[in-house]
């Protein structure tokens, strides 16, 4: 057995073995395990021309990240002359490449060749929540705000980086048992140069490679307070919603080939490199988190300012309707209702602006949500 090694033979190679001959890759594993948890509490004092009191705030956050990778280092056997296979069992290539001029001899078992995909998986999640309240020295709450957020990242990758195979100029080896090539190859210089005899046949299967990752994050703020002029409690409302997402999905194929016999049979030793569509793992958890968090900040800031502009525009329309001498009182009431908070026109504007801010269905729904529950946007 040869594992993760490179062998170079200048002359001929004789495999005179009663059992199996196995060439395989060396496999390495990598693990990432992380978790975090934090909390905080603070008290301060505030004062302005109308109110004074204590500011109390508290926050908590927790999360985790789990990743696992598998990497393979193929064995390589390079023979300058003829490779004589006198094997009583199977010739097994499990993550290996055999190159030479000519292959001959008898294999009483099968040729079993397969490529090993490298793999990588990751899953992570973060949550946070915070509350802040202003309480007057008289014990009466002046305002309260709550923020909560969540972000998630998931990734999955499996792809062959170096294909398993046998690359010769010619071959007349005889194989007794049914053979199999999984994302692997047996090539010669031309189809006519491959005189290999598979007494019980040969089957080929291709390997489907994939790379998928997805991350998303959302942050929601709610607030309520006492109007400084009316001293009445304002109903709770959404003070800001931010949403972000990032992701990618790609696939490729690692093809099998036995020159002139099976699979992509037109492939020869000269162009064997065309069989493996290399797929790079472009996932970077730090970049994905940075991207989604940036989108959250932008959409949340946009969402805080845009509703105010909608409210101002709607109020101008209401004022124009009230001043329109061509409308009856009933018509004015009907039109004003459409432009009031929760009215069909204003909700439509919020929804459209939400889509502009995030470019997604989610952000459009966020915009609609602000419209339906935003009595504070006029303050």
Locate the predicted segments by residue:
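Small-residue-rich, membrane-active alpha-helical segments
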Residues: 365, 369-378
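Transmembrane helix interruption/hinge and helix-loop junction motifs
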Residues: 358-363
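Binding/recognition "hotspot" determinant
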Residues: 1-357, 377
């Amino acid at each position: 057995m040869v594992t993760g090694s490179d062998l170079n033979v200048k002359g001929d190679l004789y495999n005179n073995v009663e059992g199996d001959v196995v060439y395989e890759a060396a496999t390495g594993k990598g693990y990432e395990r992380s978790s975090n948890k934090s909390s905080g509490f603070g008290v301060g004092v505030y004062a302005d021309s109308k109110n004074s009191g204590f500011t109390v705030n508290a926050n908590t956050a927790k999360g985790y990240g789990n990743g696992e990778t598998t990497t393979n280092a193929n064995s390589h056997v390079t023979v300058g002359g003829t490779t004589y296979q006198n094997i009583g069992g199977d010739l097994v290539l499990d993550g290996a490449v055999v190159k030479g001029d000519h292959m001959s001899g008898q294999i009483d078992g099968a040729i079993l060749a397969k490529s090993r995909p490298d793999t990588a998986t990751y899953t992570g999640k973060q949550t946070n929540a915070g509350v802040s309240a202003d309480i007057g020295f008289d014990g009466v709450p002046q305002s309260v705000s709550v923020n909560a957020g969540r972000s998630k990242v998931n990734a999955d990758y499996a792809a062959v980086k170096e294909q398993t195979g046998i690359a010769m100029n010619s071959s007349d080896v005889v194989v007794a048992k049914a053979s199999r090539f999984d994302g692997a190859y047996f090539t010669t210089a031309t189809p006519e140069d491959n005189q290999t005899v598979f007494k019980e046949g040969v089957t080929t299967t291709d390997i489907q490679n994939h790379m998928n990752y997805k991350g998303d994050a959302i942050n929601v703020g709610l607030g309520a307070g006492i109007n400084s002029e009316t001293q009445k409690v304002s109903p709770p409302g959404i003070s800001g919603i931010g949403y972000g997402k990032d992701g990618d999905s790609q696939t490729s194929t690692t093809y099998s080939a036995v020159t002139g016999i099976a699979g992509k049979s037109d492939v020869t030793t000269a162009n064997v490199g065309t069989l493996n569509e290399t797929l790079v793992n472009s996932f970077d958890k730090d970049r994905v988190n940075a991207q989604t968090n940036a989108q959250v900040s932008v959409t949340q800031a946009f969402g805080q300012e845009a509703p105010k502009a909608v409210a101002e525009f709607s109020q101008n329309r209401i004022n124009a309707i009230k001043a329109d001498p061509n409308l009856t009182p009933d018509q004015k009431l009907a039109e004003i209702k459409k432009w009031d908070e929760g009215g069909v026109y204003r909700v439509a504007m919020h929804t459209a602006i939400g889509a502009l801010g995030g470019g997604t269905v989610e952000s459009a729904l966020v915009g609609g949500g602000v419209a339906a529950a935003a009595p504070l946007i006029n303050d």
